């Protein structure tokens, strides 16, 4: 069994309040869950109105599958309007 953990740091430049940021983050996390069947949560910068850190986890029996899945998630996030990906890190357990 392989567990992949992806940490993504995002900027939400158009956000003017925590409510604006949370709306963007909720929408993105719901789309990731539905499209890629991964677990997603906001894990840092909870009180910052322009920054968000998402944690994404995937579990499978094959390392190559988990690597590909998390790369698709990164590509998807990069294409999203309204957010700028500042950094990301991946680790496998």
Named regions from a protein language model:
Residues 21:
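C-terminal binding/interaction regions
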Residues 2-8, 34-36, 50-54, 84-86:
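A generic structural signal for short beta-strands and their flanking turns/coil linkers
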Residues 11, 27, 31-44, 67:
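Amphipathic alpha-helical assembly/interaction segments
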């Amino acid at each position: 069994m392989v567990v992949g953990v992806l940490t993504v740091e995002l900027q939400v430049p158009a956000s003017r309040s925590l409510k604006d940021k949370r709306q963007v983050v909720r929408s993105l996390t719901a789309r990731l869950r539905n499209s890629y069947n991964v677990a997603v949560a906001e894990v840092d910068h909870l009180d910052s109105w322009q920054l968000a850190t998402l944690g994404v986890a995937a579990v499978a029996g094959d390392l190559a599958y988990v690597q590909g899945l998390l790369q698709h998630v990164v590509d998807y996030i990069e294409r999203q309007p309204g957010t700028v990906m500042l950094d990301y890190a991946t680790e496998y357990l």
